[in-house]
């Protein structure tokens, strides 16, 4: 029998970007061909896509690692590396994606809904793209960025029009099996249903879905029984139906007390759905009461006795049925369709949103420098950390290019203001190195006060009059 898995923890890792290529164009009669290294390809991303043919998270239970392909390295003759193909992962309709802290990242409802779970790394630039007037033939290229890697939790919340709630062995699975083609497991012991069962019900020319979920017991909102595993699957149901066992022999139970106990658990749970505010809390959903097992004479008498009291106390429609004798089922299915149709009519019409592209604002203060408490400094920021990760520290020219970029960004000025001295340890990302200040041209910066230059304060320079006097003295000595 196929296992139903509705909660898994997976590790999604996007592909790395390809490295750029450092090469020089070689051709006959062209001694100065110039750089022609291509850029690296972008890494593939991990994308979740809703597929109506997928109904469980079972595949992720056995294969929790999802890895997208990396981009290819650039080549000579200005050939860019191939980009990694995005890995489209099919998930069931109603999947909720949470991060490692339990925050909801996406609520995937509707066929074709997509969510980028992990972004692929950008490819490194080749030396052809790095060429400039100041650096006409770079002897280096940038490395590709690492792909995003994260741990995610996937939760499946059943998407159905009608949800059946009730105590264990109330006849919910039997009801679904008689009004639809679903074949759930049915037995005469509690918690026979361990996973939700979906059935498609036909009411004349109309169809809707019904979810049979595990039985509810007092304390389910705190995790007793199947607890939250049950309650999570009724969050998306537009109509809730209380299935009441009128033939139970358990002491202290009757239809009204069962309904009150079920409502107490729903009120204790009452999660407000994020991203689907039209449904609201569970207390706001339309309800119906089904008095089951009236094929038993005592149960029929009890149902007739409490029906008016239930309608007067709760104000919900009440139906008396027997799944064994198939009595009252047609009236129930059409009544549920009327409730579902009323809910669908109340929903706002879907409006296609025009995509709006907004440029990312440029943050001039995209970094911060803080002392590390040991005489060194830590530079934090998206751009400095990305630049360091793309630098090949085995290439001196690449290291110099990194220093130029950091200087233009203002990192060196910030270090000087904090009292950094040459040789102190500076940490950027995962790299720690000895800092040596430099100008974009590679000349050491004199550590003097602003507005002064020791090269202009030298007083031993020979002037024009002194040079003229020296020449005159040499001529006189030659005449003698």
Curated annotation (Swiss-Prot):
Biased composition of type Basic residues is found at 469-480
Keyword Ligase present in the record's keywords: the answer is no
Q: Where is this region: Disordered?
A: 441-480
Q: What's the top EC group for this one?
A: hydrolase
Q: Which UniProt keywords apply?
A: Cytoplasm, GTP-binding, Hydrolase, Magnesium, Metal-binding, Nucleotide-binding
Domain OCT, first and last residues per copy = 359-437
Skewed-composition ranges (Basic and acidic residues): 452-468
Which cellular compartments is it found in?
Cytoplasm
The protein's role, per its UniProt record = An essential GTPase which binds GTP, GDP and possibly (p)ppGpp with moderate affinity, with high nucleotide exchange rates and a fairly low GTP hydrolysis rate. Plays a role in control of the cell cycle, stress response, ribosome biogenesis and in those bacteria that undergo differentiation, in morphogenesis control.
Q: Fetch the PANTHER family from UniProt.
A: DEVELOPMENTALLY REGULATED GTP-BINDING PROTEIN-RELATED, MITOCHONDRIAL RIBOSOME-ASSOCIATED GTPASE 2
Annotated Mg(2+) binding sites: 173, 193
- Spell out the protein name for this chain: GTPase Obg
Q: Which domain of life is it from?
A: Bacteria
What GO terms are given for molecular function?
GTP binding; GTPase activity; magnesium ion binding
Q: What is its main location?
A: cytoplasm
Any one cellular component term from GO for this entry? Answer: cytoplasm
The organism of origin for this protein: Mycolicibacterium vanbaalenii (strain DSM 7251 / JCM 13017 / BCRC 16820 / KCTC 9966 / NRRL B-24157 / PYR-1) (Mycobacterium vanbaalenii)
Fill in the subunit field for this protein: Monomer.
> Which GO terms are recorded in the biological process aspect for this UniProt protein?
ribosome biogenesis
